[in-house]
Amino acid sequence: MALDIHAHRILILDFGSQYTQLIARRVREIGVYCELHPFDMDDEAIREFNPRGIILAGGPESVHEANSPRAPQAVFDLNVPVLGICYGMQTMAEQMGGKVEGSDLREFGYARVDVVGKSRLLDGIEDHVDDDGVLGLDVWMSHGDKVTQMPGNFNILASTPSCPIAGMYDDARGYYGVQFHPEVTHTKQGGRILSRFVQDICGCEALWTASNIVEDAIAQVRAQVGSANVLLGLSGGVDSSVVAALLHRAIGDQLTCVFVDNGLLRLHEGDQVMAMFKENMGVKVIRADAEKQFLDNLEGEADPEKKRKIIGRTFIDIFDAEASKLENIQFLAQGTIYPDVIESAGAKSGKAHVIKSHHNVGGLPEEMNLKLVEPLRELFKDEVRKIGLELGLPYDMVYRHPFPGPGLGVRILGEVKKEYADILRRADHIFIEELRKADWYHKTSQAFVVFQPVKSVGVVGDGRRYAWVVALRAVETVDFMTARWAHLPYELLETVSGRIINEIDGISRVTYDVSSKPPATIEWE
C-alpha cells in the first residue's frame, strides 16, 4: 500500500498575521504536512480535515473589540492538541473563560521570557540559565493586548516584566499558548518549540519529505491524467521548470511543452532552456521564436502597465496559436503554488494576507476545453526548489534569482526596442557573472541591470562618447515584501562598471541603486 504523506496533518487557522505562512513553512520543514485556512473555517470542514493538532496563528485584531475573530468551536471539541500564538493565545484564553486586556506597555521586537512552568512544550528548551536557575528564551514579540487571567486548569508557562502571562499551558489536554512568535528566526529556539508541539505532543511523523512528495505527486498525476496528453507553457522559471521535470518523469511523451521566446529573456536563456529540457531530458518542447511579434506590439508604448498587458496578451496569442496545432490534448498544466491557493481561499475572510498570484497561462481558447493539472499546488516556493533538486534539475537553475514575467520589458524604462534589449542583456550577464565570481550571487536575493533611455557623456581614449546609462540593482530580502539594497563591495562594483563600459559600445555610465523597499519597489517598473 502506498505511503499516505498527508496522513499526519496539522491545521493552521489564519487570523491575518503577516507571519502565518511562515508558521506553515516551519511545520513543513519539520517534515509534517499542514494546511492554512481562514479562521472562519466551518466546524464540519475542520472535522473532515481530521488534524492531529491545530495552531491558532496571530493577527492584527484586538480580542476585546466587538466582532473580532474567534476560533471555531470545533477546535476545542476535537480533543487534539492546540497551540495558540500571539492573537491565537488571546482568543483561546478568552473563549475558554480567561480574560484579555489592552496594555500600556506594548512589546514589539526582541524580548527575553522567563520559563516559569514545567510543561511538555518547553521542557529542556532554553537559551539562558540564570544563577538562580531561571530558564530564559530569546524571542520575538509583536503584541499590545495581553492575557490577564488564564482559563481554568491552565498554568503560567512563561513571563516577562510587562507581560506576566507570556505563555500558558494545560498539559493534560495538550493546550498551549505563547505570546511570542516561534515561527520567526529571531526566536532562536522557535524551530525546536514547533517541532516539540508537532512531533512530540501531536504525534506526527516526518512523512513530508522531498522524495516522498515527488513519489506522491507522480502517483497523483498518473491517476488524474491516465493516458491523456498534457500541455505546459514552459517559461524557464523555477515553477514551470519543476512542473516540466515532474510531469516528464510521471507521463513521459504524453507531455508537450510550448516555450515562447519573446526576445526579452536573459542572454542565451532560450538556448539554455531548450538544451536542458529537450536535449538533456528528452522532453517534447516546441520553441516559438516570437521576438518580432512582441517588439512590434510594444512599439511606441512607454507606460509600464500597458507594456505588461501587451506582453501578456501577445504571449497568450502565441501560446494559443501553438496549442491549436496540437491534437488530442486534454490537460493544461500550470505552476500554481500554495500561496496562490491561500490567496483565493482567504479572500472570503477578509483577514488573510493578500499575495500576488502567478499563472503561467492567462487564457486559452474555450473550444479546447482543457482540464487543469497543478502538481505544485500544495507546495511553497522553497519546497518547489527542493523537489526540483530531487528531480535532478541543476542547482543554478533551481536557485536562480526571480525574473519578472514580462522579462526585460519592465527593465527597459519607457519604450522597448531591440537595441535596448540587446545592450541590457549583455550588461545583465556581466553583472551576474561577476557576482558569481565574487561569491555574492547567493548572498543577494535578486540582482539585475536596468536600462535607462537617457544618454550621458563619457570619454573613451581620446574620444568623446555619448551613450546610454544603466543602473545596477541588488537586494537582500527574506519575503520580497520588504528588502534592503545589498551592500556590495566597492571593488566588485568597480569591476562590474569597468567591464560593462569597456565591453559594451552603447553604455557610457553605470549607476548603483541604493533604494530599499519600501519606499522603492525592487523592480523599477
From Swiss-Prot:
Please give the Pfam families that the UniProt record associates with this protein.
GATase, GMP_synt_C, NAD_synthase
Classification via Gene3D superfamilies: 3.30.300.10, 3.40.50.880, HUPs
What EC number(s) does its UniProt record assign? 6.3.5.2
Q: Which residues form the Glutamine amidotransferase type-1 domain?
A: 9-207
Q: Where on this chain does ATP bind?
A: 235-241
One example GO MF annotation: GMP synthase activity
Q: Report the top EC class in one word.
A: ligase
Q: In which pathway does it act?
A: Purine metabolism; GMP biosynthesis; GMP from XMP (L-Gln route): step 1/1
UniProt keywords (A-Z) are:
ATP-binding, Glutamine amidotransferase, GMP biosynthesis, Ligase, Nucleotide-binding, Purine biosynthesis
Question: Cellular component terms, GO, for this chain's entry?
Answer: cytosol
Reaction(s) catalysed (UniProt annotation): XMP + L-glutamine + ATP + H2O = GMP + L-glutamate + AMP + diphosphate + 2 H(+)
CDD domains for this protein? GATase1_GMP_Synthase, GMP_synthase_C
What stretches pass through the bilayer? none
* Subunit and interaction comment: Homodimer.
Q: What does this protein do?
A: Catalyzes the synthesis of GMP from XMP.
The record's PANTHER family line, in alphabetical order, gives: GMP SYNTHASE [GLUTAMINE-HYDROLYZING], GMP SYNTHASE-RELATED
Any idea what this protein is called?
A: GMP synthase [glutamine-hydrolyzing]
Look up and give the organism this protein is from. Answer: Pseudomonas putida (strain GB-1)
